[in-house]
Each structure stands twice: as C-alpha cells, then as structure tokens.
Amino acid sequence: MNWVGGSRSRVLIKQERRKQKEYFEKHRLKSKMKSLGVLSPVKNSAVSLDILNLYMVNQISCKKKIPETVRKPTHVNMNRDIKMPLRKHNLELTMSPHCVPSKLCLDDTETNVNCQRLSSKEDLGPVQSQGMDSYSMLHPQFSKIENCSFTPSSFSVELPSNRHISKLNFTSGIAPTPQKLAYEKKQNDQRSTVNCSDSLLSKLNKSQDVFSPSHKTTRFGTLFERLNSLGNRNLLTKSPAVIMDEDCRSTDEIRQSDYITEKHSIQHIWGKNGKEVSNFLEDVNQSTPNLLSENCDSFVSQNMINVLNIDEQRIKKTFNKCDYDSMGDTCVVTSSDKNHVTDRCIRNIFTVPELTFSNSTLNKTSYPEKCQPNKKYQREYNKNERNDLSTSFENDYYPSSSERKEKFENDYQEKTPQKSIQKYPANSMGNIPSEELHSKQSWDFGLDEILMEEGGIYSLKSKRISTKKISLDSAQSSRSTSYSPRPTDSCFSSSSDLPSEDEDQISQQIEDSNRMTIKTKEKMNNFYVERMAKLSGDRIVKNDDKIHKQNENFYQFSVKNNTDQFPQLQCNSAHILQNKTNDNCVLQAARCDAGIQTESESVMEEKLDVAIQCDLISKCTCRSDVSLCNLERCSGNIKADTTGGQEIHKNN
C-alpha cells in the first residue's frame, strides 16, 4: 500500500544508500587490515559499523611498534687543529703511445703517381697503378719492391667502326721479382707502340703465360678477354654478356646473340630456295660448336658441346628427308626436342612474319610444280615423322597417354550412339571463303591430302555442303568420354522451309561418312601430333584455338560416323527433318550433356515465350531435345503464370 506523497519510496532510497555505504566501508577496512597484517574480525554480519570501527582502531594501535632511535655515526676529524695549504698542480692527461717515424723512401712513389695522373689526362696510354703505401705499412719486408699489388696493362684495339675499346688485363697477387718487372715494362712499351691486330691477340695470350705464373690472374680479366675476343661476335652487336662461373645460361645468351647477328641475312635467302636455307643452317651449326670448343675451358661444360653436335646432325637429317619442300615439319621437329637452347635459336632464325609454317598441303597450293612429283615420298615421310613424334612425345611427357588412347577409342565406340550431332543449313559453308578454310586446315599434317583423295566429298570449293560439327574442348578429347566435366553445346539451327535437295544431301553425306572410317587411325595420329605441337610452345602457332577446333571437328566426325551408328543417324535425320518441315519451329541453342545421356529417352521440359510474356512450360513431342515452338504444336500440361497470379491448366 503506497503512502501519501511518495514518502515510502524516499525511505527505501535512503536505506539503499546506507547499505551501499556500509558495503564499501567494509571493503576499505578489509583492505587496510590485509595491508597491515591485522587478523580479520569474527565473521558476523550483525555487528554494527561503529563497533567494527572501534575494533579496527584497537587492533591497529596494538600492532603499532615504537621505532628504535638509530644512532648516526659521528665523523671524527683527526686533523681538526692542523691547517693544510691547498696545492695547485697541473692535471696529467693520458697520452697516445710515442710514434716512431717511418723510414720508408716515398719520393719514388710520389713521382710515379704524378706521372700517372699527367699521362691519364693527356691521352689513354698505358697506365701503371701502384698501391704502395698500405702494402708497405702492413708488410715492411717488401718495402723495397714498388710494383707489388697492382700492375694492369692496357692496349687499344682498332675496330672497323673507328672505335678504341680499351681492354684491361688485371693481375694481382704476390710481388714479383725485379727480373719479371723489367720484362713486364718491356712488354708494356711494346704494346703501346704496336697497333694491335689479330696477331697481337695471340701474342698477348702467349706472353701472359710467360710472365704471370707466379701471379693469380683475376677471373674478371680472363672472362673479359673471352668476351671481347674475335671468336665471339658479341663485341660489335651488344655489350658483352655477364658470364657466371659455369652457368649454362651465359652460353645460351652468347649463342642467342650469335644467331641474332645472322637473322638479317637469312631473310634474304629465305624466299629463294630451300637448299640455300639448309646450307646456311649447316654453316651456322658448324660454326657454333667450334666457337664454344675454343672457349670451353672455364665456363662451358662438355654436355653443352654434345648437345650442339646432336642438334646439328638432327637438322641435317630433317632437311635431307624433307627434300626442302616442307619447312613446317622441320620446325615442329626441332621445337618438340627437349633441348631448349636450339629451340630458342631456331625460333630466332625463323622469324619472317609473312610466312606461316605449313606442311605439304600449303606448299601444294603455292608451289604446285614442286610438290606433285614428291607427293608419295612426302606422304611416307609425314606418316613416319608423325608416328615417331607422337610415340616419343607420349613416352616423354605423357607416359600414360597410350593407355588413355585405347580407353578413348573403346569409350567412343560405346558412347557415340547416344550423342546428338550438330547440323548446319546447306548454305552455311558457302559464305566462308575457301582460302580461310584452306589456311585453317593447313596445320592438320597431311589431312588435306586424305580429304582431297576422297573424290570431292569435302572439296573446299564446293558451296552446297552442310557440315556436321561437334565442338568439344581439348581437355575432354584427351580424357575418356564416360565423364564430361561440363556440358557441350550442340547448336541446332534450321529454316522453316527446307527444300527436298537438302534431305538428299544429308542422306548422301551419311552414306559418304562411312568411307571416312578407314582413315580414323591416321587422324588420331594427326590429333596427337597437333596437340604435341601446341604443348611444345605457342610461339609457332598464333591462331591456336581455331586450329584446335578444326582438328577436333575432323577427328570426332570421323569417329562418330561408324557403321554401328548408321541407323541411328538415319533416325535422327528423319526426325529432325520432320520437325523442320511440319512444325513452324525455330530450334535454338539446345544444351545437352553428352556424358550423362543414357539409352532411355528422357522427357525434357522447355520454356515458351508467348505474346503475353509469360513462361509456358510444356513437354515437347520429340522428347529428346529442348526446342521453342508454338503453343498449338505442344501437348501436355501448360502452366501459364500471368501477371495476376492465376494458374490456367489446358490440354490441347
């Protein structure tokens, strides 16, 4: 029951404040007792605060100790009565040890240094630098010998470009004998007077062995000599490359610069004749091992020389086999090799932008009079080279590719009856120029000859052809088709009114496709050779994606058109023609996963666009592919989601 005027609430608030105050005071007393070490009182909460305070004061007073008086020591001055005068004396500071003056005769060294400065300002003559002071201070036993630490000799080589490149041969080490010093002075005078030529380089290399056995020739001087020697052509083109001790990369840079100097001359020889190119390559490949064998004593290993000899023999063999007509095969052979040094060098040679490397088919169009008599020989050579390249590449890089190949064929034989085939209208090939198709097919390594000999089945100039094309990724083609990572797109497009000629052409092409099964294994080899050329480097092939798709299209077309699936193809063609002629349908972009199709026909639904812009879901009569057709042609439950949210069920 509330009191009048809220007095009850005021009393309660006062009591709460008192309780809080007592609580905090108790905590303060406890903290003080703990700090002073006084025993805590009896744990009785009923004791009033005043009694508790008295108790605490009593305890504190009892524990308080009286401090003892500490006696301070009194200072007794013994000299209290005696007065001592203050002494004034200088401070003695610590001195450095007494230095003994050196007895060295520095007059000769000063005159030599002055002469050096004058001679270096006047002309770039021979310079003799002597670091005598520091060496004589550390080693006084050599104080009489002047030229002890550093005796560089210099000379200038006159080049055809009227440049004077000074070349220093730094030698440092223990001080030589006076006889050797006199001999070195004579050599320096002779070098400054004589105009250096090719004979002078050989004399200096011989004389260096005479007067420097006791010296330790620094590594920089010898490597600088090797760089600027006439054997290396790097002196005129670029600054000398940095040579690390025995690293093969430095030799690669030297070889690359040698090939760059010869790149301009090969562009003039390239268009004339294949024999001149082969002779030029033989000269280049003969010159490089000789250069490296001369300078191989410190930074070229024996393995590099062996590699160069192997490359030379291989290039000779390929040019002799190829009969100078198919340059593309030669480039593929050299680029598929494991030796990356010759790979980079050959790439530097064959950098003519106007020429694309093709095999005998492209040469057949450009030079028909050359390639026709050698057609059989080239076909045998291409076949052997493709087999060798595919087997060696599979053994080296993909050891399990042969097993994949067998599994790939078996799975294709099983899975091809369930896959749908892409069809284009009859006039689709007519719009594409024959030159573009021929340039795309030129990288198929002899595939064009097979197509040319089929009696005009796939002739490039005929325009009334409807191609069957299945676009698969290169990753799917290498795997078995029992599992497909992503669905492949099979695009169906046809016009509403097809003439009867198209039906005849489709049936004729299905019959002709059975003839292509004989060439399946050869196209398998072509497929793997093309894939190997792609993996060996994208520096040869610029339009790699187009070439990939073209190879896969030819390969899959040949594999799919077997005799086992001939009735299936007839059924598909008849069924599609029925949909084309009877229905006013536009078949567009139907997606179907080739890897998960089974023999049972799956019922597929589709979305239909009607004039009121609502999604109509229906079951198509074909039940194999998704298509967009009119509302009257579809049977099944049609659910129209209108804007008002109503559901309409119709049965047509």
UniProtKB/Swiss-Prot annotation:
Residues 1-231 bind DNA. It holds the Pfam family Redic1-like. GO terms for molecular function: DNA binding; RNA binding. It comes from the Eukaryota. Residues 473-498 have a biased composition (Low complexity). InterPro entries: Redic1-like. One of its GO terms (biological process) is meiotic cell cycle. Residues 377-388, 402-417 have a biased composition (Basic and acidic residues). Involved in recombination, probably acting by stabilizing recombination intermediates during meiotic crossover formation. Required for normal germline development and fertility. Required for meiotic progression, complete chromosomal synapsis and crossover formation. Binds double-stranded DNA. However, also binds branched DNA molecules, such as those containing a D-loop or Holliday junction structure. Probably not required for formation of DNA double-strand breaks (DSBs). This is Regulator of DNA class I crossover intermediates 1. The lineage of its organism: Eukaryota, Metazoa, Chordata, Craniata, Vertebrata.
